[in-house]
């Protein structure tokens, strides 16, 4: 009896372990809970498994998620009367909890009661780490590509529904969303732009955008927005933009329009896409160097010293004239110094009395600085050297700068002094004019070049009329024809072998306006104009330096500054 009763009890326990009449086995209960734990965790985090239906089913538990949204109505940049910062990633959001709530292992923010209205991320969400970049309303994406996609499509989130008062405000962000209700363009493209494109010459259309981002819809600026953005994040990149903005908005007279134009452009803007640049090593013979200038049709070349691994000077036609002026003795006598000396030897002899370092300029410097350096140092060639690599990029001249300015003159307001004539402005040299006659020997002309430090001599006949002009560039023909051993020939004989680079004699009158003078000297591509009277007699000389001084430096007050410096 006893054994039969015990067998019957065991059978009941095996046949119905979960029944109400039998006792439950504790080991079976624990094993059952272990089996269902993964199901419960997946039910608690439907978004991690990509279950869209579960996400819609639990829409009553939607809260502010630290992940950005791709929806245009619930995007990252939804407008509203007051911004609301996002909650921490790992802290559950509850209606009445402090920001310092304890962390949990669940990345999904849970809210006990449904919110009264949709709640969105504030502007501060874009400054969070990449671990937050996913969307509760779309398929999850944890790759960096998805992060960049949402950060680059912020303009699509311009439409949003009007939100209600947020239940939790922990921090007021320095960028209020009210200033972006009419967002003309992305502010980041102005703040973090690597470089601004060259200006088109129109001083009231200064657009800045980054080449790494798509073109903006509107280049127009709104003053309050620009001021707020630039004031909130100042830095080295903004310094140049702030300077240009000040140039755009400053209230100056029209007389300084060309000065402001030159200050807003860099030397790199004037460098051509393709050009020829000849560089000489200081160990090269002087004679071969001048022959190379003639063969390449250039008037100057930077000098490279291998010992210092840097540029130390310039070799110009003036050096050729100085060598002939110093070492020429008599006709048909070989000039040993010209034949045998190297460039470094000539520099040691010539510069031992007055050593002058190389005057150069950076490609990032303004054209105003280039003009000021040319006129202040009384030079005609200014090499543009990259300070980082040390490479020579280009050689700036008065002619190149004035031509660049003249291209944009029609797009700028015309100052009143452009309608004044040369006599009223007093531009040019009208006293103690140096000139020569057709029968003047070449050696005498070279002496005048050196003593007066001028670049050209008008050739005047017996009646006083200007018949020709002898410039420094014509002297290089002596090297081309190898006739520099006989400098007693006349100027007329030397000019008979003039090369095709002759600029010609371009004349003007003192009664012509400055606008006419600028247009004529640029079109003729010459370095100077000979001012004559009604009888075609020489009255004065107006050079490119005089014109640039009147257009750019005089309105800036640089003339007085130069006098004080000297």
Curated annotation (Swiss-Prot):
Residues the record lists as binding ADP 1: 314-319, 359, 380-381
Pfam families per the UniProt record, alphabetical: CBS (PF00571)
GO biological process: cellular response to nutrient levels; fatty acid biosynthetic process; glycogen metabolic process; intracellular signal transduction; regulation of fatty acid metabolic process; regulation of glycolytic process
Keywords: ATP-binding, CBS domain, Fatty acid biosynthesis, Fatty acid metabolism, Glycoprotein, Lipid biosynthesis, Lipid metabolism, Nucleotide-binding, Phosphoprotein, Repeat
Transmembrane segments: none
GO cellular component, one term: cytosol
Ranges annotated as biased composition (Basic and acidic residues): 54-64, 180-189
Binding site for ATP 1: 299, 314-319, 359, 380-381
Domain text: The AMPK pseudosubstrate motif resembles the sequence around sites phosphorylated on target proteins of AMPK, except the presence of a non-phosphorylatable residue in place of Ser. In the absence of AMP this pseudosubstrate sequence may bind to the active site groove on the alpha subunit (PRKAA1 or PRKAA2), preventing phosphorylation by the upstream activating kinase STK11/LKB1. The 4 CBS domains mediate binding to nucleotides. Of the 4 potential nucleotide-binding sites, 3 are occupied, designated as sites 1, 3, and 4 based on the CBS modules that provide the acidic residue for coordination with the 2'- and 3'-hydroxyl groups of the ribose of AMP. Of these, site 4 appears to be a structural site that retains a tightly held AMP molecule (AMP 3). The 2 remaining sites, 1 and 3, can bind either AMP, ADP or ATP. Site 1 (AMP, ADP or ATP 1) is the high-affinity binding site and likely accommodates AMP or ADP.
Membership in a protein family: Belongs to the 5'-AMP-activated protein kinase gamma subunit family.
Protein's UniProt name: 5'-AMP-activated protein kinase subunit gamma-2
């Amino acid at each position: 009896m006893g054994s039969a009763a015990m067998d019957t009890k065991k059978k009941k326990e095996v046949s119905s372990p979960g029944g109400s009449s039998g006792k439950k086995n504790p080991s079976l209960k624990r094993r059952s809970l272990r089996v269902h734990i993964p199901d419960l965790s997946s039910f608690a985090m439907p978004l991690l498994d990509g279950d869209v239906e579960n996400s819609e089913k639990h829409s009553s538990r939607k809260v502010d998620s630290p992940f950005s949204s791709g929806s245009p109505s619930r995007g990252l940049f939804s407008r509203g009367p007051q911004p609301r910062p996002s909650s921490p990633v790992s802290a559950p959001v509850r209606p009445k909890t402090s920001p310092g709530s304890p962390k949990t292992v669940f990345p999904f923010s849970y809210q006990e009661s449904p919110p009264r209205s949709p709640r969105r991320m504030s502007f501060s969400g874009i400054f969070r780490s990449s671990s937050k970049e996913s969307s509760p309303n779309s398929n999850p994406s944890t790759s960096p590509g998805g992060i960049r996609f949402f950060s680059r499509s912020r303009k699509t989130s311009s439409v949003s529904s009007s939100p209600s008062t947020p239940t939790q405000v922990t921090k007021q962000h320095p960028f209020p969303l009210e200033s972006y209700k009419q967002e003309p363009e992305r502010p980041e493209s102005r703040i973090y732009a690597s470089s601004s494109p060259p200006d088109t010459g129109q001083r009231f259309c200064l657009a800045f955008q980054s080449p790494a981002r798509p073109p903006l819809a509107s280049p127009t600026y709104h003053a309050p927005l620009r001021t707020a953005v630039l004031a909130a994040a100042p830095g080295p990149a903004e310094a140049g933009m702030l300077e240009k903005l000040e140039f755009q908005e400053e209230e100056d007279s029209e007389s300084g329009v060309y000065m402001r134009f030159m200050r807003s452009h860099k030397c790199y803007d004037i460098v051509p896409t393709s050009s020829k640049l000849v560089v000489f090593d200081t160990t090269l013979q002087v004679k071969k160097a001048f022959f190379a200038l003639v063969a390449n049709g250039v008037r100057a070349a930077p000098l490279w010293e291998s010992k210092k691994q840097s540029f130390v000077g310039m070799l110009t036609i003036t050096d050729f004239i100085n060598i002939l002026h110093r070492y020429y003795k008599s006709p048909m006598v070989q000039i040993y110094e010209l034949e045998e000396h190297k460039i470094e030897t000539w520099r040691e002899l010539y510069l031992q009395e007055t050593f002058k370092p190389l005057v150069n300029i950076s490609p990032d410097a303004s054209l105003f600085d280039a003009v000021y350096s040319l006129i202040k140092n009384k030079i005609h060639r200014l090499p543009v050297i990259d300070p980082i690599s040390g490479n020579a990029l280009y050689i700036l001249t008065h002619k190149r700068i004035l031509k660049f300015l003249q291209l944009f003159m029609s797009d700028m307001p015309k100052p009143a002094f452009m309608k004044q004539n040369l006599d009223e402005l007093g531009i040019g040299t009208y006293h103690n004019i140096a000139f020569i006659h057709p029968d003047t020997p070449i050696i005498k002309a070279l002496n005048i070049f050196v003593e007066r430090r001028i670049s050209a001599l008008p050739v005047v006949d017996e009646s006083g009329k200007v018949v020709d002009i002898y410039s420094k560039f014509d002297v290089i023909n002596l090297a081309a024809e190898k006739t520099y051993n006989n400098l007693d020939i006349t100027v007329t004989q030397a000019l008979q072998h003039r090369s095709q680079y002759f600029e010609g004699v371009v004349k003007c009158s003192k009664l012509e306006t400055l606008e006419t003078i600028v247009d004529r000297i640029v079109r003729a591509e010459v370095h100077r104009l000979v001012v004559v009277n009604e009888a075609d007699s020489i009255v004065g000389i107006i050079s490119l330096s005089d014109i640039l001084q009147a257009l750019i430096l005089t309105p800036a007050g640089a003339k007085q500054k130069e006098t004080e410096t000297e």
